[in-house]
Amino acid sequence: RQVEDLMCVHSLGFRGEALSSIAAVSRVEMITKPADALTGTRYVIEGSKEIADEEIGAPDGTTFLVRDLFYNTPARRKFLKTAQTEGTYISDMLEKLALSHPDISFKYINNNQTRLHTSGNGKKRDLIYHIYGREIAAALLEVNYKGEYFSLSGYIGKPVINRGNRNYENYFINGRYIKSSLLSRSIEEAYHNFLMQHQYPFTCLLYTSPSPRDLSTS
């Protein structure tokens, strides 16, 4: 309601615009129900054409089903990679969302198989265990700093947990996943005496600040 509110936006961009774009080139079914409502709503749209809008019984929360992506735009469809590759991209994105929002339960089903299902219990360590496995979850060091202008929370891995690329490095600003070469180099420099050359640490660090920050780092 005020200009200052723009400095503390917790959403992740133009979600409505993205959904509209997806609905224009696929068959989309949405089932949604607020926790305080008696019934839910089922909404179906195919190629931007509204097919159904009806009340139904549904659990709390929102489910999106996207089928036949680019079915009506074959020129775009040919640029899609294999189903396995595209599914991996989606899984990676949802893992990042889950890590930055541990209080939300995410469930991702691909070809009738559950690829990701988080509890939403708010515990970051449980999420790391679920996504990365027992070995990493058992070798974590907690980070918890609260200052006047920002807070930093999450986990870093002991030096025994490393890999040959930066896929284990996860950084978030105000709930948004970012990639920052400056931040990565700073963390890696701190591990310099503990890791072999071309080995990279595990990190899951969430930076939170109500002050204006440039988030165009990813």
Where is each model-derived feature located?
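N-terminal phosphate-binding caps/lids of nucleotide- and nucleic-acid-binding domains
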Residues: 1-209, 213, 218
